[in-house]
């Protein structure tokens, strides 16, 4: 994995306190990789001074004088903060100094800046946000998760292509299955956009499974689930809320009385395995697909372990030629300009 990843160290809730240790952990696990830490010089030097370097030229610093706040409007962040850590990290991908960028910062600003600097791939109208969700069978990739609230059938087709190429690249599956999220499996179900998208996906050459319902996401029915950003974001946030509720219920029940606490001790090994399987930190890192460069968005509240997963996803996508795979597929379908 001999790639260079640029990291926006100032983004997210914790800034360098998380991003710098995560970068070091990633480099320890990937001896051929390189990282460029982008941020305010004083903040980076302070973070590096506390934990040291030890990686020589594999870990370098790039100064950026500005920081994009989580509540900055995307348009203002793009126009007025051209020396922000986020913008400089994306610029490094544009120039070829890095093959991927990772940020835990403002999602809207990251999408706007990435699209402005890197541009979209030939044949792709709109970038989409794709992430991994755990399933009974392992995991599935879902897109779009909020970048595109309203979509045309052609956009959903493009999402299917990009999602399939992402899974092919990072999971090494030749023909990943693609499902279209709908209110029923039958072809007559859904609105006109979804019905037309299903027709396009059927003739796309992708391994199109057909319509899938919400429960199919966690059954692992398909490797990729396609939907518009409105539906995808609601599905994601609903899932997160359900997971938090179940975790709260478990804590309350196992701490209700002495007998419950004793049962909790007995069940601890199984509970730890359960926690590992559903640990959202393991799935951190949403890819911004459709750009002429690899960009991954980390959750803003990510800890060092979770942020390291986002770095790994970015490096893996870049080293496995994700951008080239999408371009080649679009060209083969005759839709790349």
UniProtKB/Swiss-Prot annotation:
Keywords: Cytoplasm, Lipid biosynthesis, Lipid metabolism, Phospholipid biosynthesis, Phospholipid metabolism, Transferase
Catalytic activity: a fatty acyl-[ACP] + phosphate = an acyl phosphate + holo-[ACP]
Pfam families: FA_synthesis (PF02504)
A single cellular component GO annotation: cytoplasm
GO biological process annotation, one example: fatty acid biosynthetic process
Pathway the protein takes part in: Lipid metabolism; phospholipid metabolism
EC class (word): transferase
Gene3D superfamilies per UniProt: Isopropylmalate Dehydrogenase
Protein's cellular compartments: Cytoplasm
PANTHER family recorded: FATTY ACID/PHOSPHOLIPID SYNTHESIS PROTEIN PLSX, PHOSPHATE ACYLTRANSFERASE
The protein's role, per its UniProt record: Catalyzes the reversible formation of acyl-phosphate (acyl-PO(4)) from acyl-[acyl-carrier-protein] (acyl-ACP). This enzyme utilizes acyl-ACP as fatty acyl donor, but not acyl-CoA.
Listed name of the protein: Phosphate acyltransferase
Organism: Aromatoleum aromaticum (strain DSM 19018 / LMG 30748 / EbN1)
Record gene name: plsX
């Amino acid at each position: 994995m001999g790639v260079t990843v640029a990291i926006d160290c100032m983004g997210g809730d914790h800034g360098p306190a998380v991003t710098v240790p995560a970068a070091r952990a990633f480099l320890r696990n990937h001896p051929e990789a390189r990282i460029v830490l982008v941020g305010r010089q004083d903040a980076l030097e302070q973070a590096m001074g506390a934990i040291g370097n030890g990686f020589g030229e594999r870990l370098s610093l790039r100064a950026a004088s500005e920081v994009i706040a989580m509540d900055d409007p995307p348009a203002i962040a793009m126009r007025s903060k051209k020396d922000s850590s986020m913008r400089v990290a994306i610029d490094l991908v544009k120039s070829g100094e890095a093959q991927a960028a990772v940020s835990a910062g403002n999602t809207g600003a990251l999408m706007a800046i990435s699209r402005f600097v890197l541009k979209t791939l030939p044949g792709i109208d709109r970038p989409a946000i794709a992430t991994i969700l755990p399933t009974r069978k392992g995991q599935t990739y879902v897109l779009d998760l909020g970048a595109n609230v309203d979509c045309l059938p052609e956009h959903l087709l493009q999402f299917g292509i990009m999602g399939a190429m992402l899974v092919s690249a990072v999971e090494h599956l030749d023909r990943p299955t693609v499902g279209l999220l709908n209110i029923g499996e039958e072809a007559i179900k859904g609105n006109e956009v979804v019905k037309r998208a299903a027709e396009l996906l059927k003739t796309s050459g992708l391994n199109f499974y057909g319509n899938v319902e919400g429960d199919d996401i966690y059954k692992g029915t398909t490797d990729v689930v396609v939907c518009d950003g409105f539906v995808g974001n609601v599905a994601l946030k609903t899932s997160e809320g359900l997971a938090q509720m179940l975790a709260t219920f478990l804590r309350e029940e196992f701490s209700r009385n002495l007998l419950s606490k004793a049962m909790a001790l007995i069940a601890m090994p199984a509970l730890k395995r359960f926690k590992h399987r559903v640990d959202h930190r393991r799935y951190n890192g949403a890819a911004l697909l459709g750009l002429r460069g690899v960009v991954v968005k980390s959750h803003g509240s990510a800890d060092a372990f979770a942020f390291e997963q986002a770095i790994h996803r970015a490096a893996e996508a870049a080293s496995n030629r994700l951008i080239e795979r999408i371009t080649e597929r679009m060209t083969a379908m005759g839709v790349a300009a």
